């Protein structure tokens, strides 16, 4: 289901632990990492889609997490043509996403990447809050940065800014 501009409605999930580290999932049989995300089905609310995707990709149930907040508006990214299925070319532009910030209230052992028959991830780790911005595939970078910035500024008081994180990383790498 695409909107008039060719964007597929989608939810993204930023799952954090008690140290404000983020869940970072390794895609099955690939060397790429990303946050859990997935499409919103017709008639499904973004929150319902978020809980479905959380279970399908991470194996967590609503009782394992607490919703801290969500982005106010849709964040969009365009998918490069060489990544688009042939039958979608010409009509599909990319994804528009509502992002949720969740806190894990369960335990690490509650994560089950094989909760469904078609897992999305075959590995995962906790990662520094801002690190995914520099590690995600290029065409998703601005959306990741936008979601992380909005959600941290609204819901995670005292969180180091991305600019401070990037400056510290730069000085550490000298």
UniProtKB/Swiss-Prot annotation:
Question: Which top-level group of life is the source organism from?
Answer: Bacteria
Q: Where is this motif: Nudix box?
A: 38-59
Family matches, as Pfam families: NUDIX (PF00293)
The Nudix hydrolase domain covers: 6-149
Q: What class of enzyme is it?
A: hydrolase
The UniProt entry, under HAMAP family, shows:
Nudix_RppH
* Record-stated family: Belongs to the Nudix hydrolase family. RppH subfamily.
Protein name, entry field: RNA pyrophosphohydrolase
Question: Which species is listed as the source?
Answer: Neisseria meningitidis serogroup A / serotype 4A (strain DSM 15465 / Z2491)
Question: What is the primary gene name for this protein?
Answer: rppH
